Design a protein with these regions (language model features):
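Cytosolic juxtamembrane helix and N-cap/initiation of the first transmembrane helix
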Residues: 1-16
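Hydrophobic transmembrane helix segments
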Residues: 16-46
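Non-cytosolic membrane-interface motifs at loop->transmembrane helix junctions
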Residues: 38, 99-111
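Core segments of alpha-helical transmembrane spans in multipass integral membrane proteins
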Residues: 43-64, 81-85
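Membrane-embedded alpha-helical segments of multi-pass membrane proteins
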Residues: 51-53, 57, 107-115
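Juxtamembrane helix-break-helix junctions at the cytosolic face
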Residues: 60-77
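Transmembrane alpha-helical segments of integral membrane proteins
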Residues: 86-96
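Membrane-water interface at the C-terminal end of transmembrane alpha helices
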Residues: 114-127
């Protein structure tokens, strides 16, 4: 049963990352909500390549990692480490910047990333 849950989780993680990669590559302007200036070609290239490319790589590992010899446990572990790092750094960066007004957004997103990362870690241990 846990293998099936882990397989579904890893698949959903891959599809989610793929969707986020597609959004980022097709419409980098979506990041203007975060205060990023996307008015120059250079900024859009950086957003597409760094964020979109990262998400595409993560999606590839989640969805095609089995073809590379990665087990479900290893893929869930990779996803866990990734989300735990992203969530922790997001919260620490917001704290460092002292974003009193906007703190709820990075705090909420960071907390969600940490929670999903912990679920992935639990599945990685069970698989």
């Amino acid at each position: 049963m846990s293998d099936r849950i882990t397989k579904i989780f890893v698949g959903l993680a891959g599809v989610g990352a793929l969707g986020f990669a597609a959004l980022t590559i097709v419409k980098p302007e979506a990041f203007s909500d975060y205060g990023l200036d996307v008015n120059t070609p250079q900024a859009r290239i950086v957003i597409r390549s760094l964020i979109g490319g990262f998400e595409l790589a993560l999606a590839g590992l989640m969805l095609l990692g089995g073809k590379l010899g990665l087990s479900l446990q290893q893929r869930a572990g990779l996803f866990s480490v990734t989300l735990l790092a992203l969530g922790s750094v997001r919260i620490l960066a917001a704290t460092y910047e002292g974003l009193d007004v906007l703190f709820h957004q990075p705090l909420g997103e960071g907390a969600l990333e940490i929670i999903v990362g912990l679920i992935a870690a639990a599945l990685a241990r069970r698989a």
